[in-house]
C-alpha cells in the first residue's frame, strides 16, 4: 500500500501552490556553460498567493514554478559553512587572490562578496548580461521563477552589473545558484559558483608596454572572431593574456605544478572572445571554467565606459568533486558526521581524499508512460522525482523511447536509481516512493501510465 504522506506531498507540495489545476508547459546557455540546456518546462503557480523568502514577500503568478524541495535549500549557504568542502574551495581561491593580487597599499585588489541573496530580478539575471529576450536560457523549464519579475539566480553573473555600477573594478562573487536539470551524480538543482571580474584603465593595461602611451583601448572597427568592434587588437590581446595567466595560476595553486592546460573557443552572450579552460587531470581532460573578455556594451551600461575587462566563472562542486574525490553531488548536502569530519583540516590547502561511506546497494525501478499529445517536458518530471524521492534518488535515465506506428503516440521509459547515502533501502520503502512518483506524474503532467 502506497504511503499516503508521499502521495500528498507529491500532489500538494511539488509546487508551492496548494492547488494546481493543470500543467502549463513551455519549451525551454547558461552562464559559464557553452552547452545549452535541454528544452524543458514548468508548472503554473496560483495567482494571488504570496511567497515568503528570506524575509521578503513575492506575489505568485503563472510563471511561479518553485518546489518545496528547492525552497528548503535557500539560505543553507554551504559555501559559508566552515570546513565544508565547498567552503574549503572558496577559501583557497580567495586566499590565492588575496595573496597574489594587491594594490600599492598592500591591500587585496579583489573584494569578495559571498552573502548576496539568491533572489534576483529577471533583468539582473538576463537583460543586464545582454541575453536576448527570446534566448532559450530564459525558459521556465531551465529556471526557478518566483514570478515573472523575480527568480532564484541561475548564475552569480546576475550580480556583475550592480557591482560594476557601484564602482568596483575587481571582485569575486560566490553563491548558490539554481537550475532545473537532469538527475545524476553530477547534477543537482542547487549548486555553487564563483565569479571573478577585473576591469582595466588604459594606464593599467598598457603600463610596462613599450610605447604604451601611444596605444588605445577603443576604436571604431568591426567585430571578428578575435575581438569586439569597439576594442583595439592590442587591448584585447593584453586582456586575454592577463585573464589566461590569472586562471592558469589559480588552477596550478589548486591542483599543483606541472598541470597541463588547454583553451577551447566557445560562446557566451556577455563575453567575446570567450573560452573554456580544460585541465589534464589523471590523464583525462576536464572542463573547469568559462571565461572571456567582457562585452563592452555591458561595461558601458554599468558606467565604466573608460575601462575594458575580463570575467570568469567556475563551479565549486565541480572542483571539489575532482580535488577531493567526492563521487556524488548529493553528498555536499549530507549532515552525516562521517562525511563532514573528513574535511576538518588545520590547513585549508591540505590534501584530502574523501573516504567513501559504506556503499549501500542501489534499488532500480522503471516507470513507463504515454506522453500527453503535446508539450511534455522532462524537467517537470525530474522535479516530481526530486520532490517525492528527495535524496533517495541517485539518478534518472531515459532508457527507452517508443512511438506507436499507428497512433503515433510516444512512450518514455525511465529507470530511477534509488540509493540512500547512509543506510540500506528496503524494497517496500522504495516501492512506496516509486508509486507516489507514478501517481504524481499522472496527476500533474497528464501522462498515461503504463505501470
From Swiss-Prot:
Q: Where in the cell is it found?
A: Mitochondrion matrix; Mitochondrion
Q: Which reaction does it catalyse?
A: tRNA(Phe) + L-phenylalanine + ATP = L-phenylalanyl-tRNA(Phe) + AMP + diphosphate + H(+)
In this UniProt entry, the residues modified to N6-acetyllysine are 202
Per UniProt, substrate binds at 157-160, 179, 186-188, 193-195, 287, 312
Q: What are the recorded GO MF terms, alphabetically?
A: ATP binding; phenylalanine-tRNA ligase activity; tRNA binding
- What domain of life does the native source organism fall in? Eukaryota
Q: Which SMART domains match?
A: FDX-ACB
- Give the matching InterPro entries: aa-tRNA-synth_II, aa-tRNA-synth_II/BPL/LPL, Fdx_antiC-bd, Fdx_antiC-bd_sf, Phe-tRNA-synth_IIc_mito, Phenylalanyl-tRNA_Synthase
Q: Where is the signal peptide?
A: none
Annotated Gene Ontology cellular component terms: mitochondrial matrix; mitochondrion
Q: What is its EC number?
A: 6.1.1.20
Sorted keywords for this record are: Acetylation, Aminoacyl-tRNA synthetase, ATP-binding, Ligase, Mitochondrion, Nucleotide-binding, Protein biosynthesis, Transit peptide
A GO biological-process term: phenylalanyl-tRNA aminoacylation
The keyword rRNA processing is assigned to this record: no
Q: What does this protein do?
A: Is responsible for the charging of tRNA(Phe) with phenylalanine in mitochondrial translation. To a lesser extent, also catalyzes direct attachment of m-Tyr (an oxidized version of Phe) to tRNA(Phe), thereby opening the way for delivery of the misacylated tRNA to the ribosome and incorporation of ROS-damaged amino acid into proteins.
Family per similarity comment: Belongs to the class-II aminoacyl-tRNA synthetase family.
Q: What is this protein called?
A: Phenylalanine--tRNA ligase, mitochondrial
List the source organism.
Mus musculus (Mouse)
Amino acid at each position: 500500500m502506497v504511503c499516503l504522506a508521499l502521495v500528498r506531498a507529491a500532489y500538494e507540495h511539488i509546487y508551492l501552490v496548494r492547488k494546481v489545476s493543470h500543467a502549463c508547459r513551455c519549451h525551454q546557455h547558461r552562464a559559464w556553460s557553452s552547452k545549452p540546456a535541454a528544452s524543458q518546462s514548468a508548472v503554473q503557480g496560483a495567482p494571488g498567493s504570496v511567497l515568503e523568502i528570506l524575509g521578503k514577500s513575492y506575489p505568485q503568478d503563472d510563471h511561479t514554478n518553485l518546489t518545496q524541495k528547492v525552497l528548503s535549500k535557500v539560505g543553507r549557504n554551504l559555501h559559508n559553512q566552515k570546513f565544508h568542502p565547498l567552503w574549503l574551495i572558496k577559501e583557497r581561491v580567495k586566499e590565492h587572490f588575496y595573496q597574489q593580487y594587491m594594490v600599492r597599499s598592500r591591500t587585496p585588489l579583489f573584494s569578495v562578496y559571498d552573502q548576496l541573496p539568491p533572489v534576483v530580478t529577471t533583468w539582473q539575471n538576463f537583460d543586464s548580461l545582454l541575453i536576448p529576450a527570446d534566448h532559450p536560457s530564459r525558459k521556465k523549464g531551465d529556471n526557478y521563477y518566483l514570478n515573472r519579475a523575480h527568480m532564484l539566480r541561475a548564475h552569480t553573473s546576475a550580480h556583475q552589473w550592480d557591482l560594476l555600477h557601484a564602482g568596483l573594478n575587481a571582485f569575486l562573487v560566490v553563491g548558490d545558484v539554481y537550475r532545473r536539470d537532469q538527475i545524476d551524480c553530477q547534477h543537482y538543482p542547487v549548486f555553487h559558483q564563483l565569479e571573478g571580474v577585473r576591469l582595466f584603465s588604459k594606464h593599467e593595461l598598457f603600463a610596462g608596454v613599450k610605447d604604451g602611451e601611444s596605444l588605445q583601448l577603443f576604436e571604431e572597427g568591426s567585430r571578428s572572431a578575435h575581438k569586439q568592434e569597439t576594442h583595439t587588437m592590442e587591448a584585447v590581446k593584453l586582456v586575454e593574456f592577463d585573464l589566461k595567466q590569472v586562471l592558469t595560476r589559480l588552477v596550478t595553486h589548486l591542483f599543483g605544478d606541472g598541470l597541463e592546460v588547454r583553451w577551447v573557443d566557445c560562446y557566451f552572450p556577455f563575453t567575446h572572445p570567450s573560452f573554456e579552460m580544460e585541465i589534464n587531470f589523471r590523464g583525462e581532460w576536464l572542463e573547469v571554467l568559462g571565461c572571456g573578455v567582457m562585452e563592452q556594451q555591458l561595461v558601458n551600461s554599468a558606467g565604466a565606459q573608460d575601462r575594458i575587462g575580463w570575467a570568469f566563472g567556475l563551479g565549486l562542486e565541480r572542483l571539489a568533486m575532482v580535488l577531493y574525490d567526492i563521487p556524488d553531488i548529493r553528498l555536499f548536502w549530507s549532515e552525516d558526521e562521517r562525511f563532514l569530519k573528513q574535511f576538518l583540516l588545520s590547513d585549508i590547502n591540505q590534501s584530502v581524499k574523501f573516504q567513501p561511506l559504506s556503499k549501500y546497494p542501489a534499488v532500480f525501478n522503471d516507470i513507463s508512460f504515454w506522453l500527453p499529445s503535446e508539450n511534455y517536458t522532462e524537467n517537470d518530471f525530474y522535479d516530481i522525482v526530486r520532490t517525492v524521492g528527495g535524496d533517495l534518488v541517485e539518478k534518472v535515465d531515459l532508457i527507452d523511447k517508443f512511438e506507436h506506428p499507428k497512433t503515433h503516440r510516444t512512450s518514455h521509459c525511465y529507470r530511477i536509481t534509488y540509493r540512500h547515502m547512509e543506510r540500506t533501502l528496503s524494497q517496500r520503502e522504495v516501492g512506496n516512493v516509486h508509486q507516489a512518483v507514478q501517481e504524481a506524474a499522472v496527476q500533474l503532467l497528464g501522462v498515461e501510465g503504463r505501470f
